[in-house]
Amino acid sequence: MIAHVVLLQPRPDLTEGQRRAALETLTSAAAHVPEIRSFRLGRRVTHGLPGYEQAMKQDYEFALIIEVDDVSALKRYLQAPAHRALGDLFSSATAAALAYDYDMT
């Protein structure tokens, strides 16, 4: 299983409604990509423990965790037209992002 992990910070000028719409579009589009086995979207939780949150160099408000079967499925997903369309939306709605892929087997 490969986890495609994306941390993202929406653009500061987006309203809450625009943020919600962009996230809903990402979620609904993911349902139509056959390689995706699991799609999870979450908002960052802060807890106030001294030193922990302050150690983070960059704030990312949301995380996407997308699971696919293997590296071949990941490549198909990343090269698919649906991913390119999502990338366009993603680029227009985010101020900062990180994406990494991990083998979870």
Language model: regions and residue ranges:
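C-terminal structural segments of small proteins and small subunits
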Residues: I65-A97
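Short S/T/G/P-rich N-terminal loop/turn motif that feeds into the first structured element of a domain
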Residues: M1-F62, D69-K75, Y102-T105
